[in-house]
C-alpha cells in the first residue's frame, strides 16, 4: 500500500498511515506463522500416532528401534524431504520470476511508450504467465509427500524383507517431523528478518 501511495503522488500523511498499517500487518503475519508451524507440527505428531495405532489395529505393530537399519534409513530419508521440498520450491519461484522478467523485457521492447507513460503494459499476460509458471513449477514438489512414503515402503520391503517398509516408514515420519519443524522455524525467522530489513 505504501508503494501505491508513493507512486500515486498522494500526500505524506497517507504514506504515514500506510506505513503504520504495513507494520501491523508484518507483525501479525510473523506471529501467525509461528502458530501455523506449531499446529503443523502437532498435526504431524498426530499423523505418526495414527500410523502406529492403525498398525496395532491391523495386528502389524512394529518397534521403531534406533538399532534397526530400516528405521535409521527411514529417518535419513525423512530428514531429507523437508530440505528437498524447500529447495525445489525456491528453485520454482526463481524460474517463475525469470519467466516474468523475460515477458517484461519483451513488452518494453515491443510496446513503445511504456517508459514514457503513453502506453499501458499488458498486465494480464504477465499475470497469466506467472500463474501458469507457478502451477507448473510446483507439480513436482507437491508430489514429494505422496511419492516418497510409497517409494520408501515398497523399496525397503524389496531390499530388506517383509516388515522393513513399515518400520522405515515410521522412521521417515519421525525424521520429517523433526527436521520439518526446524526448517520451518528457520525459514520463518529468516524470511521475517529479510522482509523487514
From Swiss-Prot:
Its main location: membrane. The chain crosses the membrane at residues 30-50, 70-90, 139-159, 168-188. It catalyses: diphosphate + H2O + H(+)(in) = 2 phosphate + 2 H(+)(out). Keywords: Cell inner membrane, Cell membrane, Hydrogen ion transport, Ion transport, Magnesium, Membrane, Translocase, Transmembrane, Transmembrane helix, Transport. Its EC number is 7.1.3.1. The record marks 29 as: Determinant of potassium independence. One of its GO terms (molecular function) is inorganic diphosphate phosphatase activity. It is found in: Cell inner membrane. Its cofactor is Mg(2+). Belongs to the H(+)-translocating pyrophosphatase (TC 3.A.10) family. K(+)-insensitive subfamily. Proton pump that utilizes the energy of pyrophosphate hydrolysis as the driving force for proton movement across the membrane. Generates a proton motive force. Homodimer. This is K(+)-insensitive pyrophosphate-energized proton pump. It comes from Allochromatium vinosum. The gene is hppA.
Amino acid at each position: 500500500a505504501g508503494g501505491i501511495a508513493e507512486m500515486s503522488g498522494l500526500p505524506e500523511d497517507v504514506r504515514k498511515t500506510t506505513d503504520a498499517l504495513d507494520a501491523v500487518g508484518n507483525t501479525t503475519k510473523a506471529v501467525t506463522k509461528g502458530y501455523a508451524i506449531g499446529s503443523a507440527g502437532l498435526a504431524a505428531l498426530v499423523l505418526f500416532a495414527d500410523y502406529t495405532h492403525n498398525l496395532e489395529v491391523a495386528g502389524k505393530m512394529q518397534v521403531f528401534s534406533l538399532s534397526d537399519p530400516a528405521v535409521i534409513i527411514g529417518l535419513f530419508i525423512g530428514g531429507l524431504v523437508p530440505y528437498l521440498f524447500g529447495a525445489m520450491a525456491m528453485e520454482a519461484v526463481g524460474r517463475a520470476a525469470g519467466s516474468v522478467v523475460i515477458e517484461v523485457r519483451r513488452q518494453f521492447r515491443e510496446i513503445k511508450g511504456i517508459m514514457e507513460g503513453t502506453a499501458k503494459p499488458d498486465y494480464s499476460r504477465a499475470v497469466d504467465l506467472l500463474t501458469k509458471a507457478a502451477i507448473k513449477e510446483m507439480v513436482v514438489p507437491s508430489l514429494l509427500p505422496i511419492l516418497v512414503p510409497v517409494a520408501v515402503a515398497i523399496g525397503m520391503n524389496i531390499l530388506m524383507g517383509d516388515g522393513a517398509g513399515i518400520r522405515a516408514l515410521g522412521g521417515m515420519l519421525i525424521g520429517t517431523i523433526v527436521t520439518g519443524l526446524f526448517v520451518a522455524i528457520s525459514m520463518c525467522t529468516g524470511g521475517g528478518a529479510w522482509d523487514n530489513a
